Amino acid sequence: MAAKDVLFANDARQKMLKGVNLLADAVKVTLGPKGRNVVLDKSYGAPTITKDGVSVAKEIELKDKFENMGAQMVKQVASKANDEAGDGTTTATVLAQSFINEGLKAVASGMNPMDLKRGIDKATEAAVEKLREMSKPCSDKESITQVGSISANSDRAIGEIIAEAMEKVGRNGVITVEEGQGLDNELSVVEGMQFDRGYLSPYFITNQENGSVELDNPYILLVDKKVSSIRELLPVLEEVAKSSRSLLIIAEDIEGEALATLVVNNMRGIVRATAVKAPGFGDNRKAMMEDIAVLTAGTVISEEIGLELEKATLEQLGSAKKVTITKDTTTIVGGAAEASAIADRVASIEKQIETTTSQYDKDKLQQRVAKLSGGVAVIKIGAATEVEMKEKKDRVDDALHATRAAVEEGIVAGGGVALTKIAKELADLKGDNDDQNVGIRVALRAMEEPLRQIATNAGDEASVVANAVKAGDADYGYNAATGEYGNMIEMGILDPAKVTRSALQFAASVAGLMITTEAMITNHVEDKELDI
């Protein structure tokens, strides 16, 4: 087993604190509308310029192992806030730095670390409750635009395009962000269910101009296995031919004789049939096939449930108003299902979203809900250079997450004002003893720090701004972008309550751990002597 280095008590905490401050000082300069840029060196290509706190935090690894432990713990705060609410990473880092600095000063002066932690936890719980009381619902387009604009570093164009996307696909709709080709941002909405599988043969193409297959009012046959023998398909093909309607076959794969016969029938005009592979892989494929079955009021022909392809009937086929297939995608519009069947399926998937812990699985399930609900919006980012494109895409991702969080838990006054007001309201909060009271004061002082940092980044005197804001009424605050004081809600400076809540909770959590740390252990690194 490798030798270890061990540090105890104040020596350990001071090393850890140095790492915390190194990371937090690099991240906090990006906070607010006048936040500064940070340039990140890359091992290849041009440097990246960013104002995204979590991007800065992810880049930092320190040489000293003990200092690095402190930095990594604060990095975890930023990542957790990002995972929970998709934004608020810089706020969480600023809060954590203040909690830890003030908390460790109290420990150094002889306070009981456990009581300090209890005091911090008590103040945090009370603040979260106040946040819930303060939050106002965010449902209209203008509020969503304002939240998106603030999160995208006061870029109103980004806020507007996100609000428009949400209006078109609904709150549960999937909105994806891609790199565009031009200089302007573009929004496109794909109606119906789309999945990334194209036609299996170019001979199926019906629209030669754009190279796509267009089927009007087709039957849809869903099969969960490979089809290579035409004998299995013949009975259902004959039934479809009698009905004079076209047919879309979605199967695990269609190859050999079966595919060749479909192509020949298509070219001769006997049966207008087109084949595509089923979307997804493994269990996800089965789930998506079931989704398509629900949407089109059909049945998945599966031997697992005793259904054979040779015995398939027209009643087991789904149908839709229109299907468009390109070489890469298939879009089903106007499935024949009743609204109640789709609603039941969506409710079932939403229950899975609540129980799953994997973010990847959540995203996949959310996409399935959106496809069933009828829409996917794609925001294409326009920029002049690759560096600008990356920076802008980061901001749009942040803004998108922030607007979702705002719709979920409501909005509060932005610019660090909500936490500053809460700190003022909780001034009389008391713990069970003097050390807990110090912990409460540490937490209340930390809650003012985001406002102070926003003012500092804007070139203003932090204490003057903080005192002026505390002297005002409920939503009175400071607009760092213009240098004006006023009602933050009316000025459109809003923060999602969920972002503020998660930033505070995660910062308090990691601060409690650091304050109560008494020893640090890391692998010993021996200095290698140079051979001369």
Curated annotation (Swiss-Prot):
InterPro entries linked: Chaperonin_Cpn60_CS, Cpn60/GroEL, Cpn60/GroEL/TCP-1, GroEL-like_apical_dom_sf, GROEL-like_equatorial_sf, TCP-1-like_intermed_sf
Keyword ATP-binding: yes
Residues that hold ATP according to the record: 30-33, 51, 87-91, 415, 479-481, 495
Pfam families per UniProt: Cpn60_TCP1 (PF00118)
Entry keyword set: ATP-binding, Chaperone, Cytoplasm, Isomerase, Nucleotide-binding
The organism's place on the tree of life at top rank: Bacteria
Cellular localization per UniProt: Cytoplasm
GO terms of biological process kind: protein refolding
Gene Ontology annotations for the cellular component aspect, listed alphabetically: cytoplasm
Catalytic reactions of this protein: ATP + H2O + a folded polypeptide = ADP + phosphate + an unfolded polypeptide
UniProt-listed Enzyme Commission number(s): 5.6.1.7
Function: Together with its co-chaperonin GroES, plays an essential role in assisting protein folding. The GroEL-GroES system forms a nano-cage that allows encapsulation of the non-native substrate proteins and provides a physical environment optimized to promote and accelerate protein folding.
Protein family per UniProt: Belongs to the chaperonin (HSP60) family.
Classification via PANTHER family: 60 KDA HEAT SHOCK PROTEIN, MITOCHONDRIAL
Subunit field text: Forms a cylinder of 14 subunits composed of two heptameric rings stacked back-to-back. Interacts with the co-chaperonin GroES.
Designated name of the protein: Chaperonin GroEL 2
Name of the encoding gene: groEL2
